[in-house]
């Protein structure tokens, strides 16, 4: 069975969910906030946390870097200043690597350029993520794949042909690839999720683990994604929806992430084995609420039972089940019964006597 191994943990096409808490830049460039987010994600049961790394001077044109950036989420007067304010230093990345190891949660990053990929590789992080914006950036894909670490690729905004090109580019040099269905809007509306693409990917790429990078607020659609075959589930994560930054509003808070992890872990148990059978936990409720056949009223000995003489009432309590009704109709009582008394086959004439009277049962 194909598997995708991250930091010693094997992720398979039909195994348990691997949950990534996407911190991105929700730390606002503050290493202490980053630590708080990492700690909270670990407490919620996430398998990994993910940050983002950019070399902004190399990544953007001078015009974009120097362009005014004045809005409620801005951390600088220009777009370049804004992006630089959100970056962590090399020393802070090292600090977070050590902190994550102490916390017992995997840390890796989305890289937007080759220099950032090389930096995280030198830091010894165990995997890379490629964002949807770089789905067709084959030079970056080739470079990151060549670093020999597992690669996640988000596929928002792409066609199947784009995805096939990305897969071919990576697999040429690196077999450790996971595709994530994604819609590259923030937040994503429910009718834009196109979760059935997960099934398309599983059919088209049978040797790859498939996942979902979910930008929709809430947890229900991630659970649907799991049921469709996504085994990596990525959700944005914050500690405060009101914090400055465009991603906080649709990110999960700790309680939401905790519930998502809990529910994903429960799904395999809830699915069961497909064999329909009574369960021990059902015995008492069904004994109380189930039905047995009893006398509808006081009935004398010798009375020939008709439809109005027998009713189904609770509790079961060892009586005959309702499906035995037809086997009692038309037969004489061997002794009187009081209202609500159980009726059994021992209470009526034998079948042989019934036949001798020329009565046919249903």
Descriptions of predicted regions:
Residues 1-362:
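Catalytic cores and adjacent flexible loops of soluble metabolic enzymes
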